[in-house]
């Protein structure tokens, strides 16, 4: 399996954010996501909160899909 952490950095402008709650500001409770350059269907997720600055997770599309479907099912959410 390709080591996603060896691929180039994601530019800040490439991130899209998904927000909810907004505990302390406009983008305080967001998860940002962007495609990883040089990879097919790989993504970087990061925390938008100041305390989470610099914390990043790289995952494949299959890993994100599995998480999203499992999370929605566990929480009783409809897709």
List the model feature ranges, each with a label.
Residues 17-69:
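A short, structured beta-strand/loop element
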Residues 70-75:
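A short alpha-helix/helix-coil micro-patch that ends at or immediately precedes a cysteine
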């Amino acid at each position: 399996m390709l080591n996603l952490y060896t691929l180039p950095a994601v530019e800040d402008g490439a991130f899209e954010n998904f927000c909810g709650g907004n505990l302390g500001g406009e983008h305080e409770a967001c998860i940002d996501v962007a495609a990883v350059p040089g990879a097919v269907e790989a993504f970087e997720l990061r925390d938008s909160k100041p305390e989470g600055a610099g914390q990043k997770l790289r995952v494949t599309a299959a890993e994100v899909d599995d998480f999203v479907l499992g999370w929605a099912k566990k929480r009783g959410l409809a897709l």
